[in-house]
Amino acid sequence: RVLVGKDEALLWALAAILARGHILLEDIPGVGKTTMALSFARALDLEYGRIQFTPDVLPSDITGYSVPDPQGGLSYRPGGILCNLFLADELNRATSRTQSALLEAMEEGQVTVDGISHPLPQPFVVIATQNPTGAAGTQLLPDSQVDRFTLRLTLGYPAPKDEAAMVKNRQAGNP
């Protein structure tokens, strides 16, 4: 067990994933948000992609981009979102323009680059993390984006006994 003492949050998250809904994890750094996403990808055998959202991340980093090919046409280079479970880590640190690159993917299951739509693998789930609004370098997510999430969770700090169990699991070689 990777996240000890978070059974209710894990059950809610699993239900959202099985329903092909998207999850917004809002919490302080270091409580297991990223670990939770990676654990679900491994446990459910889903192709995992992750982008650490910072102010310099571009929409094309997410959706992909076109490059000239030797035949004189354009060739598509997939972005980080072309996977089954995409972790948008610290989403509220990115610019609004970059955040909006997720909207089509979350709503329609595709991305459009240079007028050409590219379907996302199925199932497709976004787990986005965000630090609490007001933390340095963060901005409020727009309602149009928050509306795309099926579930919004917080994890909180583990209880001392749960933290000790996690340390013991790590020492035993479990993730």
Model-flagged regions — what are they?
Residues 23, 86, 124:
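Conserved beta-strand position immediately N-terminal to the Walker
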Residues 69-72, 93-98, 106-175:
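Canonical AAA+ ATPase core
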Residues 27, 89-90, 101:
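Walker B catalytic acidic pair
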Residues 11, 18-20, 31, 44, ...:
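Short loop/turn elements that form and flank the Walker-type P-loop nucleotide-binding site
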Residues 1-9:
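Dynamic helix-loop-helix/coil hinge segments at AAA+ ATPase domain boundaries and subdomain interfaces
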Residues 12-15, 66-88:
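Conserved alpha-helical scaffold flanking the Walker A/P-loop in AAA+ ATPase domains
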Residues 28, 62, 129:
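P-loop (Walker A) phosphate-binding loop of NTP-binding proteins
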Residues 14-55:
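Walker A/P-loop
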